[in-house]
């Protein structure tokens, strides 16, 4: 698969577009690492972080892309260590962010963060690190992997759905796997069935 990321309208978002009341009506804010490439969008996300922290909301962040990590490693590190409660990454991204050469070292880095870190590993499933606990999440088998576009996004949606409903982390991980499995079974990044019917 070859991908060329197009941020579209995301590049037009700035601090003035952030409505305090809309953000305060939610339990978790989800920030996208790709938007770090745009200075105005970065300012908008920093404003969201300030609002969420003042309101004791959880903040989730995805590393987005290996090259994105390479471009922003230091500022990502500062954000993760100071502001983030839930971190999403795939195996390559977490190794790049931690600058560890192997997965085991990257998991130790994730444990050192003392937060929830979800690491996807393609056909190997995923690992969710919750403070110092490491929970292995099995993949959901599909008849045929058709298109992996959107798998990480749907995985994050499933995990956050569970966390927002205060489910245990293994259940949250299973929700994430179910959502990701649905999206890789067909073309396109939108589910063809109602995800709540699958859990």
Protein language model annotation of sequence segments:
Residues 12-13, 50-54, 74, 99-199:
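Conserved phosphate-binding/catalytic region of the ribokinase-like
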Residues 1-135:
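Ribokinase/PfkB-type carbohydrate-kinase core domain
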């Amino acid at each position: 698969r070859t991908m060329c990321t197009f941020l579209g309208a995301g590049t037009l978002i700035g601090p003035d577009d952030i409505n305090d009341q809309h953000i305060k009506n939610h339990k978790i804010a989800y920030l996208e690492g790709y938007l770090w490439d745009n200075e105005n969008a970065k300012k908008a996300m920093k404003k969201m972080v300030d609002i969420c922290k003042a309101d004791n909301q959880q903040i989730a962040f995805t590393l987005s892309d290996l090259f994105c990590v390479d471009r922003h490693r230091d500022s990502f590190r500062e954000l993760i260590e100071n502001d983030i409660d839930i971190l999403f990454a795939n195996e390559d991204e977490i190794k790049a962010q931690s600058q560890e050469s192997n997965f085991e070292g990257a998991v130790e880095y994730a444990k050192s963060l003392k937060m929830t870190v979800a690491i996807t590993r393609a056909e190997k499933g995923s690992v969710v690190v919750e403070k110092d606990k490491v929970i292995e999440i099995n993949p959901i088998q599909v008849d045929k992997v058709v298109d992996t576009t959107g798998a990480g996004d749907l995985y994050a949606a499933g995990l956050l759905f569970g966390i927002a409903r205060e489910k245990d982390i293994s259940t949250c991980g299973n929700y994430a796997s179910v959502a990701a499995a649905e999206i890789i079974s067909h073309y396109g990044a939108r589910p063809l069935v109602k995800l709540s019917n699958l859990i």
